[in-house]
Amino acid sequence: MERLAIREIIKAVQGELICGSQRGEILGVSIDSRTIKKGEIFFALKGERFDGHDFIQKAIDKGATAAVVSRKKIVATKIAIIKVSHTLTALQELAKFYRQKFNPVVVGVTGSNGKTTTKDMLQALLSSKYTVTATLGNYNNIVGLPLTLFEISPKTEFLILEMGTNHAGEIKRLAEISLPQMGVITNIGATHLQFFRCISNVLSAKMELVQLLPRRGKVALNIDDTHLRSQFKKIKQKIITFGTDPQADVLANNIVISRPGEKERLSFTVCVGRDRKEFDLYCLGRYNIYNALAAISVAKEFGISLSLMADVLGKFKFPKLRMEKLEYGEVTIVNDAYNANPTSVKAVLSEFVSSFPSRRKIVVLGDMLELGRISRKFHQEIGKIVATSPIYSLIAIGEDARFIAQAARNCGMEGDNIFYFKDKKVASRKLKELLKPKDAVLIKGSRKMGLEEIMKYLS
């Protein structure tokens, strides 16, 4: 981060200096007193289970130069204390101010599934030619995205921002802060329905990104997604379509999936106009072709050749917890515990079954969270799929995961092979009892379930 004068910060956040001096400058921004560094400004954010105001003294002790607060009564100190109405809004406004000091090409990436992988692929492609700053991990929300903006430097030519949401208006706010010139929407699925209520509202939330793009902006959209396709005529910006539909601007065909027992590989031809190039992705999950196409759709707009892109993606290392293949003795475990929603679980189950046709298969499935009133229905749908697939055993973990187990039993799966637990440590012991050499195991659940810990319990 480039240095910022405290007087600039006061103006940007429309704050009131209630302690200390407006002279001086800050070297960075922090919201965590545990990791704050000397010279940084501390934003005292409030959450459901914490209040940053309780940690101001700790931040000062670690060398904070200034703090942004929403309380008048603060510990006596010599550092600059800036009072605002809402500290989160102030963080966002400062990020917007800082973003406007630079002129990178900003690309926003959103969608129900595949955001992080698409963002990482695009970062790899653009980094082959440009200096790129991108969202760290999955810092994709109304707190994380502003923190990413502070990573911009004068050398940044491209800024790639993952944009997540579980409420209407959030992506609009993220776009207002970051000012993207190009957008990507990977797909639309049944996510966060506890808040969105229906898929049409999910679509509307994702389309907020397009609405905030400039008239001369560009947007890459999945042509195979019927929800997105319904929006094409409403969009004023240039649309770049990707998918397997022959009408796609960036088309994948000749798709070949490696045979069971071979090294995992997805081979396909990418067609852009008259250009053709063979691509290889070394991973499980056919849906990763769509993630690659989304990234290619953006990179081609900025002069990256298909030949160079094929080379870069052929070396791409996929993020952990996404169809991550692990060996546990003679057992193969596919760890896809990063997150889960009905669309992604159905896709992963299909990939898992087809990838291990001759193996005895066990699936460990956790809750799909934030589905609201129809959560039971969606979990039951997954149970039916498990029961009608060549899966030996099901271990369901959580609260609503019990509906997966119940539906699997009701649809004819052998009851002795169905297990339900609320505790993942207990579930791990049962999994360990079941395992036999050459078994294949799938682990998948929502992020808050933390099912990757099963690997720790197994060992």
Features from the language model and the residues they span:
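N-terminal leader/targeting and accessory segments in enzymes
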Residues: M1-E93, F97, L284, S355-F356, ...
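Acidic, Mg2+-coordinating active-site environments of NTP-dependent enzymes
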Residues: R7-E8, A12, S70-T77, V184-T332, ...
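Phosphate-binding loop of NTP-binding sites
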Residues: R7-K11, T89-I223, H227-K236, A299, ...
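Active-site beta-alpha connecting loops in nucleotide-dependent enzymes
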Residues: R49, P319, A337-M413
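Short acidic-hydrophobic, aromatic-tinged amphipathic segments that line or gate anion-handling sites
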Residues: I82-H86, N417-D423, A427
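Short beta-strands and strand-loop turn motifs
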Residues: P104-T110, V184-G189, N222, A292, ...
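ATP-dependent carboxylate/acyl-activation modules
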Residues: V109, K320-E324, K448-I454
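Short amphipathic alpha-helix with an adjacent loop that forms part of the alpha/beta core around
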Residues: A427-L434
